[in-house]
Amino acid sequence: KHMKYFLLTALVSLAFLTSCRTLQNIQKPSAGAAHQSQEQQYKAAVVAKAQTAQCVTAKINMDVDADGKQISCGGSLKMKRDDVIQLSLTFLGFEVGRLEFTPKDVLVVDRIHKQYSRASYGEVDFLRQADLDFYTLQSLFWNEIFTPGSRDVRSQLNRFRLAASGDHTSLLLTDAPKLNYQFLTRTSSALLDRVTVDGKSTADQGQFVWKYDNFTTLSGKPFPALMEVSINGMGKKAGFTLA
């Protein structure tokens, strides 16, 4: 039970995704077609940052803060586009747990107690409450904007409203039934800095935040070497760091 909660908590606050690649200068978004409005051009520039790489493998060091309890371990993150997201946790060189997402379901493996659990996304409370399915999680791990329930964000760009604030521009998605989505980007580069998901109801105090930083390159495109994820409300508060 504790390992299952720990692994699900690992979703809740990711940071430090190490990479051996070097940092490169990030280009400002290019001007779009002449007929596009400035807002359309900016939205297109954000989407254009999406990765062309189909696979990512990285070693990680994870520091987890769950309800005031600090846990540290190593591991690896493996992703294959539209196929799998796998987070393996190790201690003293041995795998102690695994969290695996596929388009169909979620697998949690507890090596210590020799237990595993496989469930649909609707059966995992945290994922259901945050309206997260495989393709939404994939976008979060790959540092991409998304629209819940759709795999083609390009066809949904008219749903986003832009709001500028200092050095950042937010893409706001407020027409979803129960949740509001804010995608905070760096105006100078159109890079996604943070995703915030809030409930629409005043009675729903839950908030899910996924932050990105320390951008490196992956197949010639910027990719965050630092991810930090946190969740509060919904009866729990937790966070963790991947490095």
Question: Where are the regions that the model predicts?
Answer:
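Sec-dependent bacterial lipoprotein signal peptides
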Residues: K1-C20
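N-terminal leader/targeting segments and the immediate start of mature chains
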Residues: C20-I71
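Edge/loop elements at the starts and ends of beta-strands within beta-rich repeat scaffolds
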Residues: A48-V56, G68-I71, K78, D82, ...
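Beta-strand-dominated lipid-handling architectures at cellular/organellar boundaries
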Residues: K59, Q70-K78, L191, V209
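Hydrophobic lipid-interacting interfaces of membrane-associated proteins
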Residues: D63-D65, L92-F94, V109, H113, ...
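An acidic-aromatic
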Residues: V84-Y135
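C-terminal low-complexity, charged extensions that often adopt amphipathic alpha-helices
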Residues: G122, L127-F160
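Gly/Pro-enriched, hydrophobic low-complexity segments
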Residues: D152-A243
